[in-house]
């Protein structure tokens, strides 16, 4: 992969990128190829850019939003001598532990910067990730106690850790079990910055600078929950695997419509009879219809008595489907399938012939 540096701009650029088209209001520079040797220390490159960004925001006396995405712990891991040297016979570390040590140092550098500049008590800091463990590439991809992993509709593919720090606002040491989605961060942050109505405003249409936006956000403002003032405002989670709605969670109950017996790299099978799981009672999804599943015979009896609940999931799916009429999906889900690649090539050829 190549690396790129992007800067937002007030000027709309007419430059064209071969893959993405018109650049728009940003400046893009080629930052070179990300060779395996460079992968050893690219996180330090990213960290330095982040620290410089904080310095500039402080100098300009402006609020800032920093989204820092180190490569650790994403496959494939190439360790620098410093972190490779942390592995020894006494600790028996794999590349996972050594890579996590590097990630810990990166996070520590950012927290130290905030403290040194007197910003730590007035800054919301969140540590989280975008998907569950990619356990089929262990040890790089990590491990999880939950069923499945990245790319699946099982809990191992969707559940992620989240740690939040906001001194004076978020109670220290508090553990919250309310349902929250990554889509909730945007409305929550905007509410914390002073606008709790951003979802409703964008739904109606909102002017931001010279740009007009009219979009449907699926996120909820969760400031009350994170501040310990109330429960989660979210009751439902939609589990999309690429473009397929594979499961829905409503409070404690999860309704799963597909199976992926070989994980993300295998085929997706549509189930004639959905699997119902009470995630409070069975968070690891060990029971179900699958041959050999624990308690599978007793599960059928339990399923019959809980079948009435499917009316709830039908209503939720109908609600989200209705939003797609005015706000249709902006793009198809990604796929490594050859048919999808052929479709992309054909689309590109048609676009070229129309010029």
What would you call each of these model-derived segments?
Residues 1-12:
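Single conserved hydrophobic/aromatic residue that forms the stacking wall/gate
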Residues 30-44, 89-102:
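The substrate-binding groove and active-site-proximal loops of carbohydrate-active enzymes
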Residues 62, 250, 255, 261-262, ...:
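Long, internal low-complexity/basic segments
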Residues 62-63, 69, 102-138:
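Metal-dependent active-site segment of extracytoplasmic phospho-/sulfohydrolases and closely related
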Residues 50-96, 134-136, 140-144:
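Active-site His/acidic residue clusters
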């Amino acid at each position: 992969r190549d690396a790129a540096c992007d800067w937002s701009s007030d000027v709309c650029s007419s430059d064209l990128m071969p893959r993405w088209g018109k650049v728009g209001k940003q400046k893009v520079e080629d930052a070179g190829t990300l060779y395996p040797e460079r992968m050893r220390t690219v996180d330090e490159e990213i960290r330095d850019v982040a620290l410089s960004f904080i310095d500039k925001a402080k100098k300009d006396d402006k609020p800032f939003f920093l989204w820092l995405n180190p490569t650790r712990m994403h496959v494939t891991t190439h360790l620098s001598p410093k972190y490779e040297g942390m592995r020894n016979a006494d600790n028996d570390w794999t590349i996972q532990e050594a890579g996590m040590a590097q990630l810990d140092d990166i996070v520590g550098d950012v927290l130290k910067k905030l403290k040194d500049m007197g910003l730590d008590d007035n800054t919301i800091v969140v540590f989280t990730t975008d998907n569950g463990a990619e356990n089929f590439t262990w040890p790089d991809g990590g491990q999880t106690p939950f069923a499945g992993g990245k790319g699946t509709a099982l809990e191992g593919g969707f559940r992620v850790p989240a740690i939040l720090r906001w001194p004076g606002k978020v109670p220290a040491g508090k553990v919250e079990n309310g349902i929250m989605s990554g889509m909730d961060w945007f409305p929550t942050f905007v509410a914390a910055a002073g606008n709790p109505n951003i979802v409703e405003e964008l739904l109606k249409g909102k002017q931001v600078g010279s740009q007009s936006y009219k979009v449907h956000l699926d996120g909820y403002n969760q400031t009350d929950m994170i501040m310990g003032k109330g429960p989660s405002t979210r009751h439902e989670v939609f589990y999309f695997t690429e473009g397929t709605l594979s499961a829905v969670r409503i409070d404690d109950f999860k309704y799963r419509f597909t199976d992926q017996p070989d994980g993300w790299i295998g085929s997706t099978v549509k189930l004639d009879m959905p699997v119902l799981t009470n995630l409070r009672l069975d968070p690891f999804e060990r029971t179900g219809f699958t041959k050999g599943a624990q308690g599978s015979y007793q599960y059928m009896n339990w399923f019959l008595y809980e079948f009435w609940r499917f009316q709830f999931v039908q209503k939720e799916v109908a609600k989200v489907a209705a939003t797609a009429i005015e706000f249709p999906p902006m793009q198809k889900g990604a796929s490594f399938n050859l048919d999808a690649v052929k479709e992309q090539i054909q689309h590109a050829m048609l676009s070229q012939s129309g010029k």
